[in-house]
Amino acid sequence: IVIHLTAPIRRPGAVMTITFVDFYLNRAHIEGTKVLSNLSENGNIKFTVQVTGGKVTFPNGRGYKYDGIKYVKQIQGGNTRPIRDDAYSIEGRSKTEFNGGLVVNLNTESPLIKKVVCPWISNGVLKIKINSRVLFLDYGAPNNGNCDNKAMLTWNNGNNQRLITLP
């Protein structure tokens, strides 16, 4: 693994590039580049994480390719000392292509909200596309963004819904 830092990562404007070179974990070959960019401003945390050319190949030849980008922005608590009032907005998209032809695309339809005091995402909608099938996962349902481990999974153009329990 090669890591290149332009400055200490906590400094606004810093960029950390992680490149996997001839790297194996539990005999799986891991490739690609991960770039973390610190875009923080005015005391609020803001950063991106981008993976390009991600690829995992298992000893049996199976595996997948992955590309994605995530934007994280502090939306509450930046002006206070305790972290318990902090909350973050997460947006992004990714594409995973499995060797067998399955393609999974994830895209935030509305920002995912993660409060520090809550172990689950409390609001936001994630679009999940598996080949041609489209699903939506609404983290705000059924309690309008309150902290709970429930989310509404919708598919078939909204004709089917199921309230699911998150781990």
Where are these regions (language model features)?
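Generic structural detector for well-ordered beta-strands
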Residues: 2-4, 19, 107, 127, ...
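Short N-terminal edge-element motif at the start of the domain
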Residues: 2-40
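Short linear motifs in intrinsically disordered
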Residues: 3-9, 78-85, 114-118, 137-145
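Short, hydrophobic/aromatic-rich segments at coil-to-beta transitions
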Residues: 10-21, 44-52, 87-92, 120-125, ...
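Hydrophobic lipid-interacting interfaces of membrane-associated proteins
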Residues: 21-30, 52-59, 95-102, 131-135, ...
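Short helix-loop boundary/capping segments
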Residues: 35-116
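A cross-kingdom marker for long, charged
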Residues: 127-167
